[in-house]
């Protein structure tokens, strides 16, 4: 997903997820989600400038892999294949991307493959730190996800917890373009969302005792 598509879809996804988690009865979940979707469609279609912008963002017929973002993704994967265990090193994408073995990646935008990072932090971790780094990272996220699923099964509807779950889900959704997780500015938001959700989980645990 490009940046604009990613931002708009993640906003919608976060809103829908909040409705799904906040409302208890399944029937009301469906009704609320339908009404929210209807409201979005009406809002987009009745405001001419918004509708034109929406069409421009989503009507692209270009294959994702033939965009500059697709070139970044393919490049990071090839870097990982060359350094599968420990990766090429943190924040080395900018140096690796210009090397000759990456000139023939399967993308029409191969000449645009170089950047400071691959614009998806999962791929960034994979190419920079290899299987070891991504394995540790995914293990940690899975532990958080297990706690979220546990609280969902307990039908806990604490509003602060639900908001933190939505933020966590939006920030760590894998299928989107992102900033670099190893830059101080971007990593701040990822770390903050983790701190918030872990705090809320522990806070709810204490309340249940």
What are these regions (language model features)?
Residues 15-16, 137-140, 164-176, 180-209:
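Transmembrane alpha-helices of multi-pass inner-membrane enzymes
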Residues 2-10, 115-120, 176-189:
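Membrane-interface catalytic loops of GT-C/OST-like multi-pass glycosylation enzymes that act
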Residues 60-74, 81-82, 86-129:
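Long extracytoplasmic/lumenal interhelical loops at the membrane interface
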Residues 1-2, 22-65, 74-82, 90, ...:
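A membrane-periplasm/extracellular boundary helix in multi-pass inner-membrane enzymes
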Residues 16, 20, 29-30, 35, ...:
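Hydrophobic transmembrane alpha-helices and their immediate junctions
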Residues 2, 6, 40-47, 137-141, ...:
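Alpha-helical transmembrane segments
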Residues 1-21, 47, 130-133, 179-180:
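Helix-loop-helix junctions and helix-breaking kinks within/between transmembrane helices
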Residues 1, 5-8, 21-27, 55, ...:
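Juxtamembrane transmembrane-helix termini
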């Amino acid at each position: 997903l490009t940046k604009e598509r990613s931002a708009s879809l993640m906003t919608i996804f976060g809103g829908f997820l909040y409705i799904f988690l906040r409302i208890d009865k399944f029937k009301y979940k469906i009704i609320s989600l339908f009404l929210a979707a209807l409201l979005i469609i009406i809002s987009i279609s009745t405001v001419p400038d918004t509708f034109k912008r929406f069409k421009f963002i989503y009507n692209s017929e270009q294959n994702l892999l033939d965009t500059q973002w697709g070139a970044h993704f393919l490049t990071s994967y090839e870097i990982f294949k060359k350094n599968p265990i420990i990766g090429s090193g943190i924040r080395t994408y900018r140096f690796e991307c210009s090397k000759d073995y990456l000139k023939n990646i399967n993308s029409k935008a191969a000449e645009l493959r170089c950047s400071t990072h691959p614009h998806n932090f999962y791929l960034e971790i994979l190419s920079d730190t290899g299987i070891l780094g991504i394995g540790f990272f995914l293990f940690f996220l899975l532990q958080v996800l297990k706690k979220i699923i546990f609280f969902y099964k307990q039908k806990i509807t604490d509003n602060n917890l639900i908001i933190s779950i939505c933020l966590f889900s939006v920030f760590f959704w894998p299928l989107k373009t992102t900033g670099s997780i190893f830059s101080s500015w971007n990593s701040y938001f990822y770390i903050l969302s983790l701190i918030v959700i872990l705090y809320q989980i522990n806070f709810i645990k204490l309340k249940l005792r």
